[in-house]
């Protein structure tokens, strides 16, 4: 049985952001039930060994809030987390690795480009490579992530290129002009080898291409980039100077938005993740929430679990 837990559903900075008084953040400060941590997922084929999809800066808090990720009772050192699959090199995706430095064996799976980012930053040397293996992932080549003792996990994962962009903190250094390059942004197809059930994860996506539509069509579960409702919302709200497209994220709404682009693909459950604090769809009674729910989408709370 394939299980996925939404450890965190928010984009960078979480909800509320520490210094933000926008309507969504103000509501979350006033009612902590509205708060969401930064985007990360956990997946498992056996409900005993788990793989993280990205390691958010809130990872320690997310582990504490998720009993399935707690150390085994009676063990001095133990974690059911067998590995981390990174879909990009953004701070939001890699910073949580630093909270996993206490000597537990696991593997990091990522594109060569992201592994190079980790090698180039000596702070990640706290993850001793004799204990924490770094395993390159090639696109469009299925692989089975292994448990720390080398046994199969029961999962098959295929990474694929997604329209996006490079990490913000590398703009102008490795990405002249800010254009996306191979390995910058990956989507994942995750399959339970025993049942054949599969899901797709795209925590970042700049646009929906025909090839992407063909890949996602008929999927029982999709977790998709929900960063912004409108492309210009950060600008119009006075919260930033970039559009969603400039940040490598498609809008939910609009003729070219995710809701319209993915409307006719016969996808079972559709969840938005990586949702920015500027996005009014985070408010349960907003018109935007009503529109996306009418279109068959969900905004998950942290801790939401889906089983296939």
From Swiss-Prot:
Keyword Flavoprotein applies: no
InterPro entries: Metallo-B-lactamas (IPR001279), PQQ_synth_PqqB (IPR011842), RibonucZ/Hydroxyglut_hydro (IPR036866)
Listed SUPFAM superfamilies: Metallo-hydrolase/oxidoreductase
Keywords linked to the UniProt accession: PQQ biosynthesis, Transport
Known pathway: Cofactor biosynthesis; pyrroloquinoline quinone biosynthesis
Gene3D superfamilies associated with the record: Ribonuclease Z/Hydroxyacylglutathione hydrolase-like
GO BP: pyrroloquinoline quinone biosynthetic process
Function, as annotated: May be involved in the transport of PQQ or its precursor to the periplasm.
Protein family membership: Belongs to the PqqB family.
NCBIfam families referenced in this protein's UniProt entry, alphabetically: PQQ_syn_pqqB
Protein's name according to its UniProt entry: Coenzyme PQQ synthesis protein B
Species: Rhodopseudomonas palustris (strain TIE-1)
């Amino acid at each position: 049985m394939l299980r996925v837990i939404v450890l965190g559903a928010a984009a960078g900075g979480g909800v509320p952001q520490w210094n933000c008084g926008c309507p969504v953040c103000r509501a979350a400060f006033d009612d902590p039930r509205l708060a969401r941590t930064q985007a990360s997922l956990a997946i498992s084929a056996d409900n005993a060994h788990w793989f993280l999809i990205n390691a958010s800066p809130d990872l320690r808090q997310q582990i504490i809030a998720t009993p399935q990720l707690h150390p085994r009772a009676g063990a001095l050192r133990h974690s059911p987390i067998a590995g981390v699959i990174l879909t990009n090199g953004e701070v939001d995706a890699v910073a949580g690795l630093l909270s996993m430095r206490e000597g537990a064996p696991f593997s990091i799976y990522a594109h060569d480009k992201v592994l190079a980012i980790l090698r180039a930053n000596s702070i990640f040397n706290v993850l001793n490579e004799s204990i924490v293996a770094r395993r390159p992932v090639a696109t469009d080549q299925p692989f089975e992530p292994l448990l720390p003792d080398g046994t199969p996990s029961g999962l098959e994962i295929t990474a694929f290129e997604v329209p996006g962009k490079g990490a913000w903190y590398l703009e102008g250094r490795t990405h002249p002009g800010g254009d996306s390059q191979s390995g910058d942004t990956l989507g994942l197809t995750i399959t339970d080898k025993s049942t054949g059930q599969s899901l797709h994860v795209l925590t970042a996506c700049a646009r929906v291409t025909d090839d992407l539509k063909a890949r996602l069509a008929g999927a029982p579960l999709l977790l998709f980039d929900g960063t912004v409702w409108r492309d210009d919302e950060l600008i119009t709200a006075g919260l930033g100077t970039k559009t969603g497209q400039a940040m490598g994220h498609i809008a939910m709404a609009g003729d070219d938005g995710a809701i319209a682009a993915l409307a006719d693909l016969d996808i079972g459950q559709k969840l938005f993740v990586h949702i920015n604090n500027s996005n009014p769809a985070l408010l349960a009674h907003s018109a935007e929430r009503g529109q996306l729910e009418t279109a068959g989408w969900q905004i998950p709370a942290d801790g939401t679990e889906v089983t296939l």
